[in-house]
Amino acid sequence: MAKDKTIYTCNACGGTNPKWLGKCPHCGEWNTLEESIAEPSGSGKNRFQALAKSSPVSTLADIEAADVERTPTGLDELDRVLGGGIVEGGVVLIGGDPGIGKSTLLLQAVDALSRQMKVLYVTGEESGAQVALRARRLGLDGSQVRVQAEIQLERILATLEAEQPAFCVIDSIQTLYSDQLSSAPGSVAQVRECAAHLTRTAKASGCTTVLVGHVTKEGALAGPRVLEHIVDTVLYFEGDTHSSFRLVRAIKNRFGAVNEIGVFAMTDKGLKGVTNPSAIFLSTHSEPVPGSCVLVTLEGTRPLLVEIQALVDSGGPSPRRLSVGLERDRLAMLLAVLHRHAGVACSDQDVFVNAVGGVRISEPAADLAVLLAIQSSLRGKALPRGFIAFGEVGLAGEVRPAPRGQERLKEAAKLGFSVAIVPKANAPKKPIEGLTIHAVERVEQAIELLRGL
C-alpha cells in the first residue's frame, strides 16, 4: 500500500507547502502551517465550480438589475445590521466568542422567520433535544422550525434538496466534513470546501444561509481567509461576558452598510434589542465630574453618544499613556498636539483614557472630545452639564470636520444635550432648537472656549 503524501497547510490563508516552515510563504504569518494528508488526484470530482451561476459575456448596461428584496427577521437590531433584512440566496457568516449568544440569536431569528417561510436549523454542536430545551427556556414556539443534528455535508445538502427551506442556519461551519476529503472537520480544506458547497447551493436554490464560525484566541474568525471572501456578509458578535449587552457589527456586507452595529441585551428570555443604545455608553453622574466629555460618534449609519473619560495624574520617572477603546498611538499624538499648539503640557503626567461601556472607537472624530476630557481632568474642573464635542484634530492643530455632522448634532439635541463644540465646517446653517453650538477652527480656540464655559 502506497504511503499517503504529507503536505503542510496554512490555517490563515489555506496555502500549501511540501515541508514545514516557520513562516508561511504565501501570507507571511508565523507558526500557521499544519500537517495534513494530500488529497489523491482525481478525488472531489466536479468540486471546481463557480459559486454563482455562470453567464455569457454581455454589456453592463444591458443586464437587467432587479432591486434586492429583503425579508425582516423579526429582530429589529439584526435587521439594521443586515441592511433591512435577509436577502434571497444570501450567505451570512457570523462569528463570536464561545457563549456570547450566537446560537441564541439565530434560534430566535429562525423561530420568528418560521411564521412566514420554511426554515431549517442544522446543528453540529448540539443534539436536537438540546436545541429544543434551549428553545423552551427562551419561550419560543418552534412548531414550524425544522431541526437536523448532522455534520456530514452530503447529508445536509440532501436535506436542503428535500426540504427546500427559504432560510437555513448551519451551526457551525467548523464542525462539518465532506466525504470527498480525508482531512478532519475544522481543517482548512474542509472549512473551505464545505463553505463553497453551501454557498453554491444557496445561490442556486435561493435559500438564505447563515454560517456560524468559530474565532481564534485573538478574536479573528477561525479558518482560511477565503471563507470571509466567498460569503456575502460577515458579522462579528462582540461583548463582555461580565456585561449583559452584546454588539453585532457588520464587517462586510454586499447588501448594506459596513460597520453598522446592532445592540442587544441578554435576558432570561434571550436577546432583546436596545432601542436607545446611547444610554449604555453614558455614565449616570448626579453632578458633572472632571475628565468626562460626551462624544457623538458614528457606527455605520447610527449616531451614538459615548462618554470619554480621562484621568491625568502625577506620574513617576516614566509617565504612562493608557487607553481603553481608543488607539494608544493616537492618544500619544493628541497629547503632542495639545502641548505644541495649546500650551498644555502632560509630559510628566500619567494619562489614562477610557471609552465607557466597552465600545471601540476607531474614527478620528473622537479627537476633540479626548483632548477636552484630558484638559478637564488636568484642570480639575468639570465640563458643563449637557456638553458634547466631536471633530478630528490634525498635527498642525487644526480641527477638521467630521462626516454627517448635522445628524450627530440632531441626535445630541434629541437626547437633551444643550452645549456643543464642533468644527466650523460642521456648524449648521440653521440653529438647532435647544442646542448652543460653538464652532472652532483650531485646538487652542477650543481650549480657550472651554475655560470660559
Predicted regions and their residues:
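Divalent metal-dependent catalytic cores for phosphoryl transfer on phosphate-bearing substrates
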Residues: 128
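Peripheral, non-AAA+ core regions of ATP-driven protein-machinery
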Residues: 2-12, 16-80, 87-93, 100-110, ...
